[in-house]
């Protein structure tokens, strides 16, 4: 009988680690954007343990993380966070863990916010007994991209979304910035020496955050995504991480694939926005 995997308890301490890791990854992205495009006004602040970041009005990174997760949030704190976004002409969004202090949710409700988006936050232990062994040499190989391959990595990543031209253009610009994140590690999957898939990894306080994985249309069904996942897990182990995390749309193919690879849902995070007509 196969030995069952064990997982850290999905408690407040774990949520704090996971949310801080994602917040730090996004702040590193914002800083990379600010270095490359000073006119973008990209920046971030911290208020009462909440990380608020601006990466552009339409960027999915323009929001907060860790709201109510390390200390209770006051009305004055919320006012400061809202002013940060409003001064930059951006809408206000908050990603909130269900393990946040309940008073934070009550405060958001009183202030005119509503939930509108859900994310499965997934995790697994990173230990030698669960990380897949390195693949034998073959047609498919995964490696770290060199710094002089940032454009190759960005182009490969974006081509995975090329069936939707508007999204492909956005992902190319996004990936070019992501390749220069201070905490980022870029991986390429190659078939017969040609890049067919790309994936990213950031590390913060022993948590490895997996993100940005995509496969070019002609390279699909070759096992590239599984190979990328396994290679990043091995790298995380080598770097001393004890937990890996990734986020997915609930019930999506990405979630199912992650669960096949040993990830499980820690909790479902909720994104909040102002109700129409609220001040």
Question: Whereabouts are the PLM-identified features?
Answer:
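A conserved beta-turn-beta hairpin within the catalytic core of GNAT-like acetyltransferases
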Residues: 55-64, 116, 203-211, 220
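Conserved beta-hairpin
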Residues: 43-48, 100-114, 183-197
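Acyl-donor-binding surface of acyltransferase catalytic domains
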Residues: 70-151, 247, 252-254, 270-274
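N-terminal charged segments
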Residues: 1-86, 168-169, 180
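Short amphipathic alpha-helix that is part of the acyltransferase structural core
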Residues: 1-28, 66, 119, 129-173, ...
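C-terminal appended segment following the main domain
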Residues: 226-279
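A conserved beta-strand-loop-helix scaffold within acyl/acetyltransferase catalytic domains
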Residues: 165-218
């Amino acid at each position: 009988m196969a030995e069952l995997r064990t997982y850290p308890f999905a408690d407040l301490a774990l949520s704090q680690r996971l949310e801080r890791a994602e917040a730090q990854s996004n702040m590193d992205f914002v800083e990379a954007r600010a270095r490359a495009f000073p006119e973008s006004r990209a920046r971030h602040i911290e208020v009462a343990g909440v990380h608020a970041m601006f990466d552009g009005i339409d960027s999915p990174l323009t929001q907060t993380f860790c709201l109510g997760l390390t200390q209770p949030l006051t009305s004055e704190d919320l006012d400061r966070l809202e002013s940060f976004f409003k001064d930059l002409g951006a809408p206000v969004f908050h990603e909130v863990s269900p393990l946040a202090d309940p008073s934070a949710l009550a405060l958001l409700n009183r202030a005119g916010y509503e939930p509108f988006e859900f994310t499965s936050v997934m995790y697994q232990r990173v230990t030698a007994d669960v990380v897949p062994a390195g693949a034998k040499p073959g047609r498919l190989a995964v490696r770290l991209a060199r710094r002089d391959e940032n454009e190759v990595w960005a182009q490969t990543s974006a081509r995975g979304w090329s069936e939707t031209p508007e999204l492909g253009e956005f992902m190319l610009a996004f990936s070019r910035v992501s390749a220069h994140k201070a905490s980022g590690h870029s991986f390429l999957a190659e078939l017969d020496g040609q890049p067919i898939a790309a994936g990213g990894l950031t590390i913060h306080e022993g948590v490895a955050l997996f993100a940005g994985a995509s496969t070019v249309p002609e390279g699909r069904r070759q096992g590239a995504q599984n190979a990328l996942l396994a290679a990043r897990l091995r790298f995380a182990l080598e770097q001393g991480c004890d937990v890996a995390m990734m986020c997915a749309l609930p019930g999506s193919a990405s979630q199912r694939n992650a669960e096949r690879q040993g990830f499980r849902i820690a909790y479902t995070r909720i994104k909040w926005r102002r109700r129409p007509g609220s001040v």
